[in-house]
Swiss-Prot record:
This is High frequency lysogenization protein HflD homolog. Belongs to the HflD family. It is found in: Cytoplasm; Cell inner membrane. GO terms for cellular component: cytoplasm; plasma membrane. Gene3D superfamilies: HflD-like. Pfam families: DUF489 (PF04356). Coiled coil: none annotated. InterPro entries: HflD (IPR007451), HflD-like_sf (IPR035932).
Length: 221
């Protein structure tokens, strides 16, 4: 499940992409929980990243640079100076929890099997409906998160407005996005990502993020 080997030359780039993918999910979760936002195309990109079981390319698995632009731009400030306000502190909390859960998922065979079963079921549904945003597909992936990731620790407590957190559709979107964040965390870990090393190589990761943004200017929204 979600497993492939990466050439050494791509490992640092893929670590930057993986962290940006984690942060993208955290940003979208926060926006739904606080504002009831409807992420639309970004949610669809995140769903497709969950379904990319055998992609050999991290960027293709995560979507494209445009979908990661905001998180790539935010990655450097968070790595270099830490969170500058309560919103960024919350994003960092979500992101660190997602990276930890990615590690623990890979070590838990039953949770890994449950994720694979849920992803394969969603793939079959998409083959029928052709739309990854179909309500039943989002609900199914959310259920996969609950059943597979809910047994792991730490538990992610999402903060926000109760009217959004209690809405079944918003709650399903949030859980699906958390699953996509764990998928990005798995990519990061497969590229050699480790939290202590991230602090030591933060300057190099920032350089990778800046180069990715600079080489894809045409994708700006």
């Amino acid at each position: 499940m979600w497993s492939f080997l990466l050439p050494d030359a791509r490992r640092r780039r893929d670590r930057a992409l993986g962290l940006a993918g984690v942060l993208r999910s955290a940003l979208l979760v926060q926006d739904i929980a606080r504002n009831g936002a409807q992420p639309g195309d970004l949610l669809q990109t995140c769903i497709r990243s969950v379904l990319a079981l055998d992609s050999k390319d991290s960027l293709r698995a995560l979507g494209d640079i445009d979908s990661l632009r905001h998180s790539l731009a935010l990655l450097c400030p968070l790595l270099q100076r830490g969170p500058g306000n309560a919103r960024e502190a919350e994003l960092l909390r979500y992101s660190m929890a997602l990276t930890t859960l990615g590690k623990r998922l890979l070590k838990n065979a039953s949770a890994t099997r449950r994720v694979q079963e849920g992803v394969e079921q969603a793939q079959r549904q998409i083959a029928h409906f052709a739309d990854p945003m179909q309500r039943s597909i989002v609900a199914g992936l959310a259920q996969t998160y609950t059943e597979a990731i809910g047994i792991l620790r730490p538990r992610i407590i999402v903060s926000g407005e109760s009217r959004f957190l209690s809405d079944p559709d918003d709650a399903a979107r949030i859980r699906t996005l958390l699953l996509s964040g764990i998928r990005a965390a798995v990519l990061w870990r497969q590229a050699g990502g480790r939290l202590p090393a991230t602090i030591l190589e933060r300057r190099a990761l920032c350089q990778e993020a800046e180069e990715l943004l600079a080489t894809h200017p045409q994708l700006t929204r």
